[in-house]
Amino acid sequence: MNNLLCCALVFLDISIKWTTQETFPPKYLHYDEETSHQLLCDKCPPGTYLKQHCTAKWKTVCAPCPDHYYTDSWHTSDECLYCSPVCKELQYVKQECNRTHNRVCECKEGRYLEIEFCLKHRSCPPGFGVVQAGTPERNTVCKRCPDGFFSNETSSKAPCRKHTNCSVFGLLLTQKGNATHDNICSGNSESTQKCGIDVTLCEEAFFRFAVPTKFTPNWLSVLVDNLPGTKVNAESVERIKRQHSSQEQTFQLLKLWKHQNKDQDIVKKIIQDIDLCENSVQRHIGHANLTFEQLRSLMESLPGKKVGAEDIEKTIKACKPSDQILKLLSLWRIKNGDQDTLKGLMHALKHSKTYHFPKTVTQSLKKTIRFLHSFTMYKLYQKLFLEMIGNQVQSVKISCL
């Protein structure tokens, strides 16, 4: 008899638990003194507290939590929990307190929580790469670079990189790499030409200068007819009109014209004259010897489609340090349908704090943008443009500036 009673009680307990867990809203058992019965009452939802248990006649009464108090689950408590008052040192408020959530604090970028303190993420030394990036809750995990990989920098983000395959770039292996440095390649001068940039920053600024602020209906046709050298054919002009906005058409036309006439004296003269601009840009940017991780951060900060790690690797191998930023900016422009590189750079500078650029790099990029927009360069662009198209369309361009 006792065994039968025990089984019945266990079954009843399981049935009640199943009922209270599976129904919605969730239920709880409450003994009602007035009727001397166990009642199945509704629990209170998140953001409220239990004001009055249910009765045989009335449902459970719940009331909203007051300011600075919360409950984050269905419950039977007659009071709300007090929100955490402040975040710890080196933390920021990820989510403010409200009636359904406690204040959520998180360590600032580059730090993680260890007991009560936000400690700086570990930086992996040369010869070691990041295998698990640090998070606000976890430290960086480093591991020694395996055979065929290397890391030549101290970084909390950079993984080990694969040794350069010299033969891919038409070069010879002169010194085998190890865990702390890459393979060293050498080759003839022809191999160094692989860092070619189709349109430099100065040329792009010059070509975009040629875009009139006010368009005449036949501006592109006038420009096509008056450009010296080999003419851009009608089919190409129509394709440019179909595929690009009015603001982009002039840039695309001049870019194509330059490619078709690269051996013409007029193009060579323009390139020579614009060397003044190129030398100044090199003075601003060329000295910035950035690591792989810093170059990747710069590319990540640009809007639109990103230049990937593989392209950055190839650029580091094919270009000398002074040309690497310019080459990557050229790749970004091509990848994004010839978007304005200077506008992309200005976007990157607005978000430079997020990506932790070195101060010297930020200053160099700002100086470059100011220089390319300066009155001195404006006068040079105007002079070159009028020399290029001759006197026949001077009045058209000048009226549009």
From Swiss-Prot:
N-glycosylated. Contains sialic acid residues. The N-terminus is blocked. Gene3D superfamilies: Death Domain, Fas (1.10.533.10), Tumor Necrosis Factor Receptor, subunit A, domain 2 (2.10.50.10). The record marks 400 as: Involved in dimerization. It is found in: Secreted. InterPro entries: DEATH-like_dom_sf, Death_dom, TNFR/NGFR_Cys_rich_reg, TNFR_11, TNFR_11B, TNFRSF_decoy_receptor. GO terms for molecular function: cytokine activity; heparan sulfate binding; signaling receptor activity. Highly expressed in adult lung, heart, kidney, liver, spleen, thymus, prostate, ovary, small intestine, thyroid, lymph node, trachea, adrenal gland, testis, and bone marrow. Detected at very low levels in brain, placenta and skeletal muscle. Highly expressed in fetal kidney, liver and lung. Keywords: Apoptosis, Disease variant, Disulfide bond, Glycoprotein, Receptor, Repeat, Secreted, Signal. Induction: Up-regulated by increasing calcium-concentration in the medium and estrogens. Down-regulated by glucocorticoids. PROSITE patterns: TNFR_NGFR_1, TNFR_NGFR_2. Glycans are attached at residues 98, 152, 165, 178, 289. TNFR-Cys repeats lie at residues 24-62, 65-105, 107-142, 145-185. Residues 1-21 form the signal peptide. Residues 198-269, 270-365 form the Death domain. Its main location: secreted. Homodimer. Interacts with TNFSF10 and TNFSF11. It is linked to Paget disease of bone 5, juvenile-onset: An autosomal recessive, juvenile-onset form of Paget disease, a disorder of bone remodeling characterized by increased bone turnover affecting one or more sites throughout the skeleton, primarily the axial skeleton. Osteoclastic overactivity followed by compensatory osteoblastic activity leads to a structurally disorganized mosaic of bone (woven bone), which is mechanically weaker, larger, less compact, more vascular, and more susceptible to fracture than normal adult lamellar bone. Acts as a decoy receptor for TNFSF11/RANKL and thereby neutralizes its function in osteoclastogenesis. Inhibits the activation of osteoclasts and promotes osteoclast apoptosis in vitro. Bone homeostasis seems to depend on the local ratio between TNFSF11 and TNFRSF11B. May also play a role in preventing arterial calcification. May act as decoy receptor for TNFSF10/TRAIL and protect against apoptosis. TNFSF10/TRAIL binding blocks the inhibition of osteoclastogenesis. This is Tumor necrosis factor receptor superfamily member 11B. It comes from Homo sapiens. The gene is TNFRSF11B.
